[in-house]
């Protein structure tokens, strides 16, 4: 049972790291979140994005 718990925790940690690296900052300069929507649609297939530190972040 201990091994199962350890494997489960390891799987969760790996899944979190993979998911957080899947999307993120893209090389598009912006001043408003609406400028990121089209760029994020092209990269991720979703318009969910925002302008963060003058760079688009897609979700």
UniProtKB/Swiss-Prot annotation:
Give the record's family classification. Answer: Belongs to the short scorpion toxin superfamily. Potassium channel inhibitor family. Alpha-KTx 16 subfamily.
Enumerate the residues marked as the site Aromatic residue of the functional dyad: 59
Q: Any idea which UniProt keywords this protein has?
A: Calcium-activated potassium channel impairing toxin, Disulfide bond, Ion channel impairing toxin, Neurotoxin, Potassium channel impairing toxin, Secreted, Signal, Toxin
Compartments (UniProt record): Secreted
Per the record's keyword annotation, is Disulfide bond included, yes or no?
yes
Coiled-coil stretches: none
Q: What is this protein called?
A: Potassium channel toxin alpha-KTx 16.3
Q: What does this protein do?
A: Blocks calcium-activated potassium channels.
> What is this organism's lineage?
Eukaryota, Metazoa, Ecdysozoa, Arthropoda, Chelicerata
Please name every pair of cysteines joined by a disulfide bond in this record: 30-51, 36-56, 40-58
Q: What GO cellular component term, any one, is given? A: extracellular region
One example GO MF annotation = potassium channel regulator activity
Chief subcellular site? secreted
For this protein, the record's PROSITE patterns field holds:
SCORP_SHORT_TOXIN
Q: Looking at the record's lineage, which domain of life comes first?
A: Eukaryota
